[in-house]
Amino acid sequence: GIPCAESCVYIPCLTSIGCSCKSKVCYRN
C-alpha cells in the first residue's frame, strides 16, 4: 500500500482518510 505521513507506534492512524496500521507504519488501503 501507499504509506501515510505518520507512524502508528505511539498514535493511531488517520482512519478517516483510509489509513491502517501495518508493521508499525500507516498505509492507505
From Swiss-Prot:
Per the record, the domain of life is Eukaryota
* Chain segments annotated as transmembrane: none
Disulfide bridge positions per record:
4-19, 8-21, 13-26
Q: Name one GO biological process term.
A: defense response
- What post-translational modification information does the record give? This is a cyclic peptide. Contains 3 disulfide bonds.
A Pfam family recorded for this sequence: Cyclotide
Q: Which family does it belong to?
A: Belongs to the cyclotide family. Bracelet subfamily.
What is this protein's function?
A: Probably participates in a plant defense mechanism.
Q: Domain comment?
A: The presence of a 'disulfide through disulfide knot' structurally defines this protein as a knottin.
Instruction: State the name under which the record lists this protein.
Output: Cyclotide mra1
Organism ancestry: Eukaryota, Viridiplantae, Streptophyta, Embryophyta, Tracheophyta
